[in-house]
């Protein structure tokens, strides 16, 4: 009983520390990275996320579901978070990728699961429509997605086509007035709850990468269905499933981009997807620091706080430099993208660095908490499970290394 009380007392101290965000942020200065307006935006999103998302993070993970008592999608829409890169005429903020990274970082700090679903909605779906949609498509789909009334998703991977996306088997056969889709898509984030999905299928099975087309799918389309929700290791509550297409008719006006140009739509968006999602592991690393710093101040061994020991201070230093270097890289590349300089190797580099560092920082957070880090009274285990996803999703760490190496070799 005494040990349980001690655990809960320390856990309570950590919860209280979340309420002093300004003090925490002072220890992680962004003065060299952000201007005053960007800092105010970061503080505003941090306050929103800690008040409206963080209190549900443990329950979301435990139940593998968003809370029923609050509509987080609509709440984020009311706070103008979904359309950060979208034009104002559709309800967006038109602020750019740096602001988008800042928002995703702070949401991830509150809940990794909510952040990855938010990233798919705001970047992978909405931003792809902004970049590639026709005026009619934008007018039809963007306002409801940006407001949070509708949820978006994207599907390219299949049970037997992951990194080798060009080997996809999902087909789109031409018919009068449109196409008929048949096949399956796998690991679709937001799939079970999405109203609007961007889906890639082969319109010409003999043309290789030039035979793939992107389509806008609506959940009500006959022949489209979702399979059972997947039970994941981490990012639990971020609904993920398999998509099934059985003679699903898609009209011509729902082609995104042009027929045969799906790989261009995919790859041009993938660079920006990797950049924005790289802010997710940055937020997870910050969440680790939010837990560890108050813990090592409260936890005593040998008559003094364990944070006074050099071994612990060394761990804190390693965690801090991993966080700040990753954050600086993400912000710098986001600024370049806002200036029209989209570099595949740096977009891949941001998420390669941040994802692998986040896994290591989460492991160190568990180590700093010792036995408490290994029990579910503390969120460190959840943070580790969530962090690992970023080494796999949006292209694995191995694929990111290939992209970087190929770009470096090509330019030489």
Curated annotation (Swiss-Prot):
One cellular component (GO) term of this entry: mitochondrion
Keywords: FAD, Flavoprotein, Mitochondrion, Oxidoreductase, Transit peptide
Binding site for FAD: 154-163, 187-189, 299, 310, 367-371, 396-398
Tissues/organs with expression: Expressed in flowers.
Keyword Transmembrane found: no
GO molecular function, one term: flavin adenine dinucleotide binding
Matches recorded under SUPFAM superfamilies: Acyl-CoA dehydrogenase C-terminal domain-like, Acyl-CoA dehydrogenase NM domain-like
Signal peptide region: none
Domain of life per record: Eukaryota
A Pfam family this chain is assigned to: Acyl-CoA_dh_N
EC number: 1.3.8.5
UniProt catalytic activity: 2-methylbutanoyl-CoA + oxidized [electron-transfer flavoprotein] + H(+) = (2E)-2-methylbut-2-enoyl-CoA + reduced [electron-transfer flavoprotein]
Gene3D superfamilies associated with the record: Acyl-CoA dehydrogenase/oxidase, N-terminal domain (1.10.540.10), Butyryl-CoA Dehydrogenase, subunit A, domain 2 (2.40.110.10), Butyryl-CoA Dehydrogenase, subunit A, domain 3 (1.20.140.10)
Record's protein name: 2-methylacyl-CoA dehydrogenase, mitochondrial
UniProt source species: Solanum tuberosum
């Amino acid at each position: 009983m005494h040990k349980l009380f001690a655990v809960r007392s320390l856990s309570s101290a950590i919860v209280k520390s979340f309420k002093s965000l300004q003090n925490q942020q002072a220890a992680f200065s962004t003065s060299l990275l952000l201007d005053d307006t960007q800092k105010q935006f970061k503080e505003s999103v941090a306050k929103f996320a800690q008040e409206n998302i963080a209190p549900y993070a443990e329950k979301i993970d435990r139940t593998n579901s968003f809370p029923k008592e609050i509509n987080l999608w609509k709440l984020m829409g009311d706070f103008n978070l979904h359309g950060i890169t979208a034009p104002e005429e559709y309800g967006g903020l038109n602020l750019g990728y740096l602001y988008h990274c800042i928002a995703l970082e702070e949401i991830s700090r509150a809940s990794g699961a909510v952040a990855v679903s938010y990233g798919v909605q705001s970047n992978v779906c909405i931003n792809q429509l902004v970049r590639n949609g026709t005026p009619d498509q934008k007018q039809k789909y963007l306002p409801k997605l940006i407001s949070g009334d509708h949820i978006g998703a994207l599907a390219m991977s299949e049970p037997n086509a992951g990194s080798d996306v060009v080997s996809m088997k999902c087909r789109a056969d031409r018919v009068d007035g449109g196409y008929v889709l048949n096949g399956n898509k796998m690991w679709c984030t937001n799939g079970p709850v999405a109203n609007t999905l961007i889906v890639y299928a082969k319109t010409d099975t003999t043309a290789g990468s030039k035979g793939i087309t992107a389509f806008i799918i609506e959940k009500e389309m006959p022949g489209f269905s979702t399979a059972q929700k997947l039970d994941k290791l981490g990012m639990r509550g971020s609904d993920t499933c398999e998509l099934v297409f059985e003679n699903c008719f898609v009209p011509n006006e729902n082609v995104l981009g042009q027929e045969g140009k799906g790989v261009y739509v995919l790859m041009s968006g993938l660079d920006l997807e990797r950049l924005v999602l790289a802010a997710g592991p940055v937020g997870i690393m910050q969440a680790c620091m939010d837990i560890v710093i108050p813990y090592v101040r409260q936890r005593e061994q040998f008559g003094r706080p364990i944070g006074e020991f050099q071994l612990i201070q060394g761990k804190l230093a390693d965690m801090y430099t991993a966080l700040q270097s990753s954050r600086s890289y993400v912000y710098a590349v986001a600024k370049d993208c806002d200036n029209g300089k989209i570099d595949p190797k740096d977009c891949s580099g941001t998420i390669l660095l941040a994802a692998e560092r986040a896994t290591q920082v989460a492991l160190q957070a568990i180590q700093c908490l010792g036995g408490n880090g290994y029990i579910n009274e503390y969120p460190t285990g959840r943070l580790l499970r969530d962090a690992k996803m970023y080494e796999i999703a949006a292209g694995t760490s191995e694929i990111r290394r290939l992209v970087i190496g190929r770009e470096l070799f090509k330019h030489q």
